[in-house]
A protein has these predicted regions:
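Class I Rossmann-like S-adenosyl-L-methionine
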Residues: 1-102
Length: 102
């Protein structure tokens, strides 16, 4: 599976709204889906699954990264990629490199 940059950005934006702005995860995901009606079933599944998992593993992932909590978009993307690595999801190796190209 490839991580496409727009999906990684969507995950990072959802995390920012959850942790920086204090919104509930389900409402953030619902708003993201309403704002992006062109996302398909797989895109929606990817975003929802991974946002919930990263919320669940939030503190552990920051320990793995060995960094203080930082809510910048770049740091949240890095956190998401750390989650993909730790969870050992089947991803293409180049997906990590491509995901950081803006």
């Amino acid at each position: 599976m490839r991580i496409h940059p727009p999906l990684l950005t969507a995950v990072a934006q959802c995390l920012e709204q959850i942790f920086a702005e204090g919104y509930y995860a389900d409402k953030v995901i619902e708003r993201a889906f309403k704002a992006n009606k062109k996302w398909g079933v797989r895109d929606r599944k990817f975003i929802a699954e991974n946002v919930y998992e990263i919320v669940r593993w939030w503190r552990f992932l920051w320990v793995v990264l060995d960094e203080p909590v930082n809510l910048s978009e770049y740091s949240l993307k890095k956190l998401a990629l750390a989650y993909f690595y730790v969870s050992k999801k089947e991803l293409e190796i180049n997906a990590f490199v491509d995901a950081f190209r803006l």
